[in-house]
Amino acid sequence: MISRVTEALSKVKGSIGSNERHALPGVIGDDLLRFGKLPLCLFICIILTAVTVVTTAHHTRLLTAQREQLVLERDALDIEWRNLILEENALGDHSRVERIATEKLQMQHVDPSQENIVVQK
């Protein structure tokens, strides 16, 4: 650690004595690559983790909203199915069918003595 500081100070003293100009981004990048590899890697990992957390939270919210909509649709279909069952039972009621047959179609009960049985060969 002390050698690093000494090296950095000697560079600074050397650059002060000379008229050489250094670009600040280049100095920062050089310093990061030389002495800050671990913090730089950790910083990149933190940024990637944060982006992943935000993306996951967004997808979770979308899926939760979609699930709620599907639950509402399922409930509506369940109500419609129950109404259709009731309608089927009402329309298939024997007394209703018999009443329609006698009133609208003028059908009558057949006397067993008037029945004809047809046998097909």
Swiss-Prot record:
What kind of membrane protein is this, topologically?
Answer: Single-pass type II membrane protein
For side Periplasmic, which residue ranges? Answer: 58-121
Q: Which UniProt keywords apply?
A: Cell cycle, Cell division, Cell inner membrane, Cell membrane, Membrane, Transmembrane, Transmembrane helix
Q: What spans does the record annotate as topological domain Cytoplasmic, numbered to this chain?
A: 1-34
Q: Where in the cell is it found?
A: Cell inner membrane
GO BP field:
FtsZ-dependent cytokinesis
GO cellular component, alphabetical, reads: cell division site; plasma membrane
* NCBIfam families reported for this sequence: ftsL_broad (TIGR02209), PRK10772.1 (NF008040)
State the similarity comment. Belongs to the FtsL family.
In its UniProt entry, what is this protein called?
Cell division protein FtsL
What is the species of this protein? Salmonella typhimurium (strain LT2 / SGSC1412 / ATCC 700720)
Recorded name of the encoding gene:
ftsL
